[in-house]
Regions:
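Nucleotide/phosphate-binding catalytic cleft detector across ATP-hydrolyzing
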Residues: 1-140, 157-208, 212-269
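Short, glycine/acidic-enriched loop or turn micro-motifs at the edges of active sites
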Residues: 29, 145-146
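Internal active-site segments that recognize and position negatively charged phosphoryl groups
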Residues: 139, 147-148
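Amphipathic beta-strand/beta-sheet edge segments enriched in Tyr/Trp
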Residues: 150-153
Length: 269
């Protein structure tokens, strides 16, 4: 018997506006989220697909089944879009997902018949959701279910980034998050060694997003061991998609806030 996700059920019965100006997406390894400006969160559901191919089309921040991802998006959104509407889609893309992630994500999003597909670095989207001053260097740690990223933003642009394939799904809920804490500290230290501006960003404090930010013990351990403020973003699990939606509203007037899915990305270290 197949379990029914309550969020998906609510999304199916939620009314949609007649016009569809745009949709923000966050394609995570564990959860997929969509947000429409002026309408709010459309759904927050498990990243799963059905039919041929893997059950989980995205694994540890990598799209391993593009057709499956497309089917998932069509199942969740396709039949709900206005027949004559072609949405502008913006994707919160992992900074170190590279060209491959953006290209595969854009291909999958074509299932929605978009007028255009744009991407924005997930860390930038998180900062937007938090309403953070981007005029100063900022460290963002995004702790997901299977991947953790630490990103240094300077003037709102990605200056350096690190990734490790570990997340909250790799540890027991009742166990201390030592593995994740050690990974974040190692990544912050590596960026600090390479980029001098990291020191100022660390004094300012780390912005914490993703499901890991919902664990107070993780915030406490990072604050204690880094000797720096660590601030969870409000509703951290939806921060990336909310920030992408905020940027979506200014794309028409200021297209530089998001880049085409074929654009360059920082090189992984």
């Amino acid at each position: 018997m197949t379990a029914v996700d309550p969020h998906a059920a609510r999304a199916r019965h939620r009314p949609w506006p007649r016009r569809c100006p745009g949709i923000a997406l966050d394609l995570g390894s564990a959860r997929t989220r969509a947000w429409m400006p002026g309408h709010g969160l459309l759904f927050d559901v498990p990243t799963v697909t059905f039919g041929d191919g893997p059950l989980h089309p995205i694994r540890r921040g990598v799209i391993v089944d593009t057709p499956g991802t497309a089917r998932m998006l069509d199942r969740l959104l396709g039949h709900r879009l206005p027949r004559l509407g072609r949405p502008l889609v913006i994707l919160a893309a992992p900074v170190l997902g590279g060209m491959a992630f953006r290209t595969e994500a854009r291909t999958a999003a074509e299932a929605l018949r978009p007028q255009s597909v744009l991407t924005v670095p997930a860390a930038r989207a998180v900062a937007e959701a938090a309403g953070t001053d981007l005029g100063r260097p900022l460290l963002v740690a995004d702790i997901g279910a299977h991947v953790t990223d630490v990103v240094l933003l300077i003037d709102g642009t990605v200056a350096d980034a690190r990734r490790t394939a570990v997340g909250t799904g790799d540890i027991d809920r009742s166990a201390p998050p030592a593995r994740i804490t050690e990974a974040v500290i190692a990544m912050v230290s590596a960026i600090l060694d390479d980029t001098p501006q990291t020191r100022g960003a660390l004094r300012r404090g780390i912005l914490l997003a993703g499901g890991g930010a919902l664990r107070p013990d993780l915030t406490y351990r990072l604050t204690e061991q880094l000797q720096a403020p660590v601030r969870p973003v409000p509703a951290p699990h939806t921060a990336a998609v909310r920030g992408a939606a905020a940027l979506l509203q200014s794309v028409h007037g200021h297209p530089s806030v998001a880049t085409p899915a074929s654009g360059d990305s920082p090189h992984p270290h």
